[in-house]
Amino acid sequence: LKVRGPRGTKITLRYAEDVAADGSLDVTSNEKALATDVYVLRGQGWETYEPRFTFHGFRYVEVIGLPEPPRLDQLEGRVVHTDVASTGQFTCANPLIEGLHRATRWSQRSNLMGYPMDCPQRDERLGWFGDAMVTADEALLNFDTLGFFRHWLDGIRRNQNPTNGDISIISPRPYVPDEPDPTWSSAYPVVVWQCYLVSGDRQFLATHFEAMRRYVDYLGTQAREDVLPKYWIGDWGST
């Protein structure tokens, strides 16, 4: 944001993915996330503000409190994500499919923030296993994310329950016994395997073999007549 005005003027920026029928900001998909920045002017000519301690996933931004009529060059959206090089490309004869691929790449980058997030806009922004499991293959083929996933997988391994071998469903996160679900925790061995298939590096398997074995043994203790009980999260909608 580039702005000028009297000292003490308060500028508020609110972010959302949609607008209502009347043109007002629709923050429904933000859930409990405030998605709001407030900047107070010094009053010394043109000033520039950019968030340093947060990020926002949005399509629309509402600017409140400008002391002058706004100009298009006063506001700029900047893309922020983990610095991963583009390593894959896709072309075909169908512009619609190519457009879907471009949108997928943008969605993926928007959720690479040191770990694979579930969403960049609302009040979670967490490393849910289910989301990472269904997108890791695409991320590995489109971007140089082997180091990214190596770091994430190492965190999962270190955070494994030392008592019974169980694995949580979110990382990074301290382990808590929150009804772990194999349909989500199994992202751990799945993503390890995907990294190996893409890289051919057996170190992925060697590093995580023991932790994965302990996890499979844990699932065996939960099974009844070789059938695991119903867990709470399941496919969770689109994931």
What does each of the following model-derived ranges do?
Residues 2-121, 130-131, 147-150, 164-174, ...:
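Extracellular/oxidizing-compartment recognition motifs
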Residues 66, 134-145, 188-204:
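Well-ordered alpha-helical scaffold segments within catalytic/enzyme domains
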Residues 98-101, 105, 146-157, 189, ...:
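Hydrophobic core segments within long, regular secondary-structure runs in both alpha-
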Residues 109, 157-158, 200:
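Residues at helix-coil transition
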Residues 123-133, 144, 179-190, 207:
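Aromatic- and histidine-enriched alpha-helix N-cap/loop-to-helix transition segments
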Residues 128, 152, 184, 188, ...:
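Tryptophan-centered motif/residue detector
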Residues 137-166:
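N-terminal hydrophobic signal/anchor transmembrane helix of membrane proteins
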